[in-house]
Amino acid sequence: MASYSTNDFKPGLKFIQDGEPCVIVENEFVKPGKGQAFTRTKIRKLISGKVLEINFKSGTSVEAADVVDYNYTYSYKDEDFWYFMHPETFEQISVDAKALGDNDKWLVDQAECIITLWNGAAISVTPPNFVELAVVETDPGLKGDTAGTGGKPATLSTGAVVRVPLFVQIGEIIKVDTRSGEYISRVK
């Protein structure tokens, strides 16, 4: 099995830590004035989603994770599973709620998602960075009500709740960043 040295560490690198695939979120090489150099890393476990900070001594090796990312198109959902289709082979894959996490609120028909497979099983689903959704419920924006610049909550067609500016009305289509859950703009 392949392995990576701390010299190879960079954000996005996937490796095995405590028997679970992880991805490096941040890393920093530290050379203290006294003592051995080390690499300070922030990792996210792909199955549990936990974020940890771990220090590796300089030159330490870690086992590479046999993790593969594939592009799939969201098809439909039943009681227990969400189904995705490969755009070229038309092969379908089912994903359970644990692998999907809270990303189900960003799934719309035909959305291009990245599914991460480990040992042939789906362990995570990454929705597109931006989605366009309809506002189905929000408070009316009152004229002159600008004391709080935080906006107002709006419920979208998938059930997600985001903060939107006061001028957004029910029925409008808005663009949302799925990574942060923030309103980006209205769609013309």
From Swiss-Prot:
The record's listing under PROSITE patterns reads: EFP
- Pathway(s) this gene product operates in, as recorded in its UniProt entry: Protein biosynthesis; polypeptide chain elongation
Q: Quick check: keyword Protein biosynthesis in the entry?
A: yes
Q: Name one GO biological process term.
A: peptide biosynthetic process
Q: Which Pfam families match?
A: EFP, EFP_N, Elong-fact-P_C
What keywords does the record list, in alphabetical order?
Answer: Cytoplasm, Elongation factor, Hydroxylation, Protein biosynthesis
Q: Which domain of life is it from?
A: Bacteria
InterPro entries to which the protein is assigned, alphabetical: Elong-fact-P_C (IPR015365), NA-bd_OB-fold (IPR012340), Rib_uL2_dom2 (IPR014722), Transl_elong_fac_P/YeiP (IPR020599), Transl_elong_KOW-like (IPR013185), Transl_elong_P/YeiP_cen (IPR001059), Transl_elong_P/YeiP_CS (IPR013852), Transl_elongation_fac_P (IPR011768)
UniProt xrefs under SUPFAM superfamilies = Nucleic acid-binding proteins, Translation proteins SH3-like domain
Record-linked CDD domains:
S1_EF-P_repeat_1 (cd04470), S1_EF-P_repeat_2 (cd05794)
Molecular function GO labels:
translation elongation factor activity
Q: Which family does it belong to?
A: Belongs to the elongation factor P family.
Q: Any idea what job this protein has?
A: Involved in peptide bond synthesis. Alleviates ribosome stalling that occurs when 3 or more consecutive Pro residues or the sequence PPG is present in a protein, possibly by augmenting the peptidyl transferase activity of the ribosome. Modification of Lys-34 is required for alleviation.
Q: What is this protein called?
A: Elongation factor P
What species is this protein from? Haemophilus ducreyi (strain 35000HP / ATCC 700724)
* Classification lineage: Bacteria, Pseudomonadati, Pseudomonadota, Gammaproteobacteria, Pasteurellales
Name of the encoding gene = efp
